[in-house]
C-alpha cells in the first residue's frame, strides 16, 4: 500500500509539473462532422478519441485527432506496412488507451498514452516527435502539419494530456479510421 501511495504521489507531482510548464493559451477547437466522435462523456463515461487518417505518403500517415467530438491536434504515424513492428502504423480499429508515466530524465517525469491490445504489437504510444523517424510505429501529435511532419509536438502532447486529465483520465477509448 505504501508503494502505491508513493507511486500516486509521484504521478500527481509529474502531472502538476507538466501543467505548470505549459499554461499556454491555445486556439478553440472545432467540431467534427463524423458522428462516431460526437458521443459526450455523459453518454459514454470516459474519454473518446477519434483519429482520422487523411494523408498517406510513402514516408508517413498524417491525420487529425478528435477528443470527445472536438478537433484537437494533428497526428503523424509511419505508413501502413502489414502491421510490422517499428515501421508500420497500427491497423484501423478500436482500442483501449491508458495513461502511462514515463521517465524523461533522472529529475523529470511526464505522461504519455499507451494504446493497448494492438494485434502483434506492444508499447504503442502517443508521444512527442516531429517526423516519421521519431515514431517507431507510435503516434506522434502536433499543432500544425507539413509534408511528412507535424509541428509543436511538445506543446500538443502536453495539451492532449491536460485535456484527458480534465475529462477524468480514465476509460479512454480510441477509434482509428482511414478517410
For each feature predicted by the language model, list its residue ranges.
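Cell wall/extracellular polymer interaction/catalysis modules
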Residues: 2-172, 178-179
Amino acid at each position: 500500500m505504501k508503494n502505491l501511495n508513493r507511486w500516486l504521489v509521484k504521478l500527481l507531482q509529474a502531472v502538476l509539473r507538466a501543467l505548470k510548464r505549459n499554461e499556454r493559451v491555445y486556439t478553440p477547437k472545432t467540431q467534427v462532422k463524423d458522428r462516431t466522435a460526437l458521443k459526450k462523456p455523459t453518454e459514454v463515461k470516459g474519454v473518446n478519441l477519434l483519429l482520422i487518417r487523411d494523408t498517406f505518403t510513402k514516408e508517413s500517415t498524417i491525420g487529425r485527432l478528435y477528443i470527445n467530438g472536438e478537433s484537437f491536434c494533428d497526428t503523424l504515424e509511419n505508413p501502413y506496412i502489414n502491421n510490422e513492428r517499428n515501421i508500420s502504423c497500427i491497423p484501423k480499429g478500436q482500442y483501449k488507451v491508458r495513461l502511462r508515466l514515463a521517465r524523461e530524465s533522472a529529475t523529470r517525469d511526464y505522461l504519455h498514452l499507451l494504446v493497448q491490445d494492438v494485434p502483434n504489437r506492444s508499447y504503442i504510444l502517443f508521444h512527442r516527435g516531429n517526423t516519421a523517424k521519431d515514431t517507431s510505429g507510435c503516434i506522434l501529435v502536433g499543432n500544425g502539419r507539413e509534408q511528412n511532419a507535424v509541428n509543436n509536438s511538445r506543446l500538443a502532447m502536453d495539451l492532449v494530456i491536460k485535456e484527458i486529465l480534465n475529462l477524468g483520465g480514465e476509460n479512454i477509448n480510441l477509434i482509428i479510421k482511414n478517410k
